[in-house]
């Protein structure tokens, strides 16, 4: 008996796989690719990256077979894939300006976008969210990126009766950071 509340269970009930595209094929996308062979109802239609050869290597190094990689459409420009039947775009360039331009094009084409681009989210997230509402699509942060993890911690704390006073991003750990104060923190950046 399958529990219906799990997203994976809901996904498995679909007749056709969700067609997705990645924009940027670096570390985060490679982590997804490492799990791709276990996902029956998600199909990678396209990968956009400025270095197509490296993107293909990342696919192979993440465990995709040569046969699967050959079926993926690779491009170095988002404009070349906008006419394809892609349901969800994952923007993972890490560049706030480029990421915002990509997300804007995707949203205006009436398709969903997942930002794995905290840089674009913190600089233009409100704009992109409003634009998505206007176009009746979803612009979401990716689970596993810093903003979504912070929100998860806030929700957990509130659900357990804690009053949230403050929440923020942790940074790379270094022993000297342990004794940082609001007055000394800026010296670390």
Named regions from a protein language model:
Residues 1-62:
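N-terminal Rossmann-like dinucleotide-binding module
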Residues 75-108, 119-125:
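Beta-loop-alpha module in the N-terminal Rossmann-like domain of NAD(P)-dependent dehydrogenases
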Residues 51-84:
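Conserved N-terminal Rossmann-fold NAD(P) cofactor-binding segment
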Residues 152-189:
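Conserved anion/nucleotide-ligand pocket segment
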Residues 98-105, 117-137, 143-145, 152-156:
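Rossmann-fold NAD(P)-binding glycine/threonine-rich loop
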Residues 50-52, 94, 118-121, 143-145, ...:
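Short, ordered loop/turn segments at secondary-structure junctions
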Residues 112-114:
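A short hydrophobic/small-residue beta-strand
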């Amino acid at each position: 008996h399958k529990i219906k509340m799990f997203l994976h269970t809901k996904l498995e009930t679909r007749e056709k796989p969700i067609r997705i595209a990645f924009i940027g094929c670096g570390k985060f996308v490679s982590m997804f690719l490492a799990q791709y062979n276990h996902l029956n109802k998600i199909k990678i239609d396209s990968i956009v990256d400025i270095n197509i050869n490296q993107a293909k290597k990342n696919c192979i190094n993440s465990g995709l077979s040569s046969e699967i990689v050959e079926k993926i459409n690779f491009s170095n420009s988002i404009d070349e894939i906008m006419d394809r039947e892609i349901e969800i775009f994952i923007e993972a360039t890490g560049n706030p300006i480029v990421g915002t331009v990509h997300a804007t094009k995707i949203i205006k084409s009436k398709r969903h976008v997942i930002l794995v681009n905290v840089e674009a989210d913190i600089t233009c997230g409100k704009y992109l969210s409003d634009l998505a509402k206007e176009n009746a699509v979803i612009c979401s942060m990716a689970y596993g990126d810093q903003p979504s993890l912070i929100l998860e911690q806030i929700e957990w704390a509130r659900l357990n009766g804690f009053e949230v006073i403050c929440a923020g991003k942790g940074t790379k750990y270094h022993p000297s950071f342990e004794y940082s104060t609001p007055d000394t923190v800026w010296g670390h950046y």
